[in-house]
């Protein structure tokens, strides 16, 4: 009976005394029966069918009544006409579209034989009771009145605990999907002995003790068990309890943190030999063969999840340099670089064991660190920097939940500390230089003041960071290597994340990750030499030596002028596009989430024309390459700019055989 209710007498009593106890199962059943209107037209007994249910004596007396009075009695409806009123979709008494077959049966029965609608009929006839999304929080003892009840569905309610003593012993199916149950202990005080299916998916089951309640001692006849989308983390102990269920054939554990470990499916299949279906996927003989023997060494397998994040090409980026004026001799010299950021969950053990959190599987993979922009180095300098490891460790910042002001304050304090350290380092190493060439300027680390006392001076050194670059609470921001502009920017980024806090990983997958394309703009200015930097005596000595040199050497010396010194402004970071990548499919059993994040069109016909015009003026040696490039069409009607996009793939690592699992133990 779909969301059916108590008996008719219960309905009358509730109608007279007011509503029943709110939140109880019996109240929800009674309320649903009231909405079926089983005692109102065209159901029940009334002037529309009273003569069919009058006692025999009354009918004999009625035959003696004069015909004149007979005309005062309203005309009664036939059973077929009354049934037509509840069956027709155009009738005001028609059933709702979502009405169940049992609801339709009840209404038709109330027309054909309304005298059967009694307590004894409800409690002895119905074998199925479905109360879905009715706000039920308590299963009361009135449920025991259903003597033949075999199926009880209480999905999408507010049940936190069930008194198993109130469950009929005849139950074979108990579905509690989408409630608030935190432990199975309440069901094990007096579990229905004939139960064959138990559904506890999308509840709040948590803790290692739950494995003690899924044994054959409590559920000797259990064939199907759904524990999906809870917070169970201990796979080994859970499988140990499930292995006692000899009749278990269907099992759902996906959506739990324990299903994120690489050996989840193989270990479960090898441990439960009689299992036929796992997470709605049939267990094949080939799978059983591939994972044979894995359960023997289950305790040695690490309880951690492994993800591989791959970022491919970035397309549709606007080249901002075409909008800047040509630099004069006094600057500013403007450089642009582009990279992609994403946030990923932070492990609690990360600070103590950084290598256990992230393992770079590509030589260009670097950890995103907001303070790293102070270095002002290009890609080659980043690879050659001996302090690169220190920067990467420092970039792992912890962001706790809080207001935006608190986050900004913490970020400012962190940047101030880093600036002080870098200022000391720059004093020891001296002022760095800039390498000039015909086509590019390679800018090294800019000099910093020896001391930072005033807050105003410190504020000038801080980078202008877009608020969108701050990671979500509990996550860390990662980024690809900075790349110069091109029509297609290849990131070639791959990072492996190994995480032990599985509950935090599940929460992160439900929330998703934010992927952003960032533009970094740096302004550089020539450094005016001071008298201390260029002493006169040294120059005179050099001039005397130069007089002795031939004229050809002078020309050669002029070409080898020392590189100019530049100072850099704090980098300006701009988020060109940002969007959320949904990772819930990884929790629901998918192995890979692959998508192209589309942030819309940022380029125009005019900007593409400027870019092409600039590229056509480059060195003649690259003329062939320029000809092969795609030229933007001159007609606006045929112009279709490419949207700003980035290719992202996140893979949940899963073992495909027992050999692969054992190799992980060696590594």
From Swiss-Prot:
Q: LRR repeats at which positions?
A: 148-169, 170-191, 194-213, 221-242
Report biased composition (Basic residues) as residue ranges.
Answer: 390-399, 617-627
InterPro entries (alphabetical): Cilia_flagella_integrity (IPR050576), LRR_dom_sf (IPR032675)
Domain named LRRCT: residues = 256-294
Outline the segment boundaries, as ranges, of region: Disordered.
1-24, 374-407, 533-570, 616-640
Extent of Acidic residues compositional bias: 377-386
Give the Polar residues compositional bias ranges. Answer: 1-11
Domain of life, per lineage: Eukaryota
Could you tell me where the Basic and acidic residues compositional bias lies? Answer: 540-553
Q: Which UniProt keywords apply?
A: Leucine-rich repeat, Repeat
* Protein name per its UniProtKB record: Leucine-rich repeat-containing protein 43
